[in-house]
Amino acid sequence: MAYSTREILLALCIRDSRVHGNGTLHPVLELAARETPLRLSPEDTVVLRYHVLLEEIIERNSETFTETWNRFITHTEHVDLDFNSVFVEIFHRGDPSLGRALAWMAWCMHACRTLCCNQSTPYYVVDLSVRGMLEASEGLDGWIHQQGGWSTLIEDNIPGSRRFSWTLFLAGLTLSLLVICSYLFISRGRH
């Protein structure tokens, strides 16, 4: 079955919230799941495999993720639109790659984790951020469909395999693009 990027990312954020949260699902994720009924469970094999892959990307690049997120979240009034702006910067030439897609998904999962696990984050910031990342991510659907879907892309990326290591390497390189885009985005000013 072909899943949308929105469905995959939401299932990943819910899965990640269960793994790293305090045992409860953030109300924003509950609402998003009601608004976009999931055709796959956060416990689905595809979600679990992507979660392992993205966790590895986040772990290997934790300083980059933290620094980029801290710069990004300095102003929150239009954070939903800011996600779209960063997405456009990363994929501006219309030439997505698996590395770019995974770096984007890992960054979004990290952002969701950071927001949902911090009890002092205002509800509206979490809401705007989750909505922004889910909506921006829909821009990957055409390319993902051309590649055979999210399920096909993960089939050969089994932890410990050579392809898994190569995918991690490419995603790590792509993170440099994410950092550059966030710096450009911030230095140009917002809106």
UniProtKB/Swiss-Prot annotation:
Entry membrane topology: Single-pass membrane protein
Glycosylated residues in this chain: N22, N118
Matching SUPFAM superfamilies: Bcl-2 inhibitors of programmed cell death
Subcellular localization: Host membrane; Host mitochondrion
Pfam families linked to this entry: Bcl-2
Ranges spanned by the short sequence motif BH2, renumbered to the chain: 142-157
Region of interest: Interaction with host VRK2: 1-18, 89-142
Residues annotated as transmembrane: 166-186
Superkingdom of the source species: Viruses
Keywords: Apoptosis, Early protein, Glycoprotein, Host membrane, Host mitochondrion, Host-virus interaction, Inhibition of host apoptosis by viral BCL2-like protein, Inhibition of host autophagy by virus, Membrane, Modulation of host cell apoptosis by virus, Transmembrane, Transmembrane helix
Main location class: host cell
Intervals of motif BH1: 89-109
Cellular-component GO terms for this entry: host cell membrane; host cell mitochondrion; membrane
Homology family: Belongs to the Bcl-2 family.
Additional comment: EA-R is part of the restricted EA-complex.
Its job: Prevents premature death of the host cell during virus production, which would otherwise reduce the amount of progeny virus. Acts as a host B-cell leukemia/lymphoma 2 (Bcl-2) homolog, and interacts with pro-apoptotic proteins to prevent mitochondria permeabilization, release of cytochrome c and subsequent apoptosis of the host cell. In addition, plays a role in the inhibiton of host BECN1-mediated starvation-induced autophagy without affecting basal levels of autophagy.
Subunit structure: Interacts with isoform 1 of host VRK2; this interaction is involved in protecting cells from apoptosis. Interacts with host PRA1; this interaction seems to modulate BHRF1 anti-apoptotic activity. Interacts with host BCL2L11. Interacts with host BAD and BBC3. Interacts with BALF1; BALF1 acting as a negative regulator of the survival function of BHRF1. Interacts with host BECN1.
Protein known as: Apoptosis regulator BHRF1
Source species: Epstein-Barr virus (strain GD1) (HHV-4)
